[in-house]
């Protein structure tokens, strides 16, 4: 599992870095690493998953060159909130994942802005429109990333029967 999410994080970081050069999408670059953190929070509970979320956030910090630790903190916070939400719900399906990704992007970006530039930067109307646009695009891409992760886990034999991520016929409600 660690190697799968490590490779997925590197691919996500490469795509997030290159997408603005390939496509004219401006500020609407999907946050693929956050989708991975939400998947960790929904389906993998334990200290290793929390450590992986922190390392994924720290990798964003290393690639972006911004304040070291800010993205690590925000990605870990989104992971913990998603973990708490999934432990309280009976069913964690794609719709719950999409909503968690949308809220996670808003929490991460608003928290990063509030910490790095103070709360005065949150009142700009154009900024809020861009944040909601990025959250919507990231939420729309989330099911594809969840599907790719589930197929990769199945291909590598990482699914254990009876777990939340198991999609056997006896557990059809998870689709």
What are these regions (language model features)?
Residues 1-175:
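Terminal, non-globular segments
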């Amino acid at each position: 599992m660690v190697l799968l999410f490590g490779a997925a994080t590197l691919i996500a970081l490469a795509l997030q870095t290159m997408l603005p050069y390939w496509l004219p999408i401006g500020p609407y670059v999907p946050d693929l690493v956050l989708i991975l953190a939400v998947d960790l929070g929904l389906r993998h509970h334990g200290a290793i998953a929390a450590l992986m979320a922190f390392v994924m956030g720290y990798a964003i910090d290393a690639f972006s060159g911004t304040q070291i630790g800010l993205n690590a903190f925000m990605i870990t916070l989104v992971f913990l909130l998603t973990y708490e939400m999934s432990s309280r719900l009976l069913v964690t399906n794609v719709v719950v994942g999409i909503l968690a990704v949308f809220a996670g992007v808003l929490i991460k970006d608003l928290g990063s802005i509030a910490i790095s530039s103070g709360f005065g930067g949150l009142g700009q109307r154009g900024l809020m429109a861009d944040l909601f646009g990025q959250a919507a695009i990231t939420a729309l891409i989330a099911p594809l990333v969840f599907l790719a992760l589930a197929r990769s886990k199945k291909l590598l034999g990482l699914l254990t029967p009876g777990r939340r991520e198991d999609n056997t016929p006896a557990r059809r409600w998870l689709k």
